[in-house]
Amino acid sequence: MAVLNINGLSYVADAPADTRLLWVIREHLRLTGTKFGCGMGLCGACTVHLDGEAVRSCQIELADAEGSRITTIEGLDPKGQHPVQQAWSELQVPQCGYCQSGQLISAAELLDTNENPTDDDIDNAMSGNICRCGTYVRIKKAIKEAVELKKQV
């Protein structure tokens, strides 16, 4: 059993210590915005923030997450007003939408660490996120729009 801080709330997870964080979030806590893609940490669909850093939750064991601040897509901004969420919506980025929670979490980390990312910065930050629909051009455009939206806040 572990106590987790997810999206600012305390949760008790009754699961073995080696259970992957992804399954604790989705199956035990029913926060289903974080997606299962590959299970190997390669696609980025399961990305969450762990103490502010974008990580693949399918690669993190429950025991390693205990005591950390975890943010899922549900907690990025519960009202959907984070600059990346606004830009994604305004520019209609998603096609199927499956990868988008991981894309948004990765983009949010980029903007937290780099106020004015270059195209190369964006490519590097987002390189671990695969979009099977190929919306990469829209994703990059939305990140640039989010930079501008963040400046207005």
Regions found by a protein language model. Name each.
Residues 1-153:
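Signature of N-terminal electron-transfer/Fe-S-associated modules in redox systems
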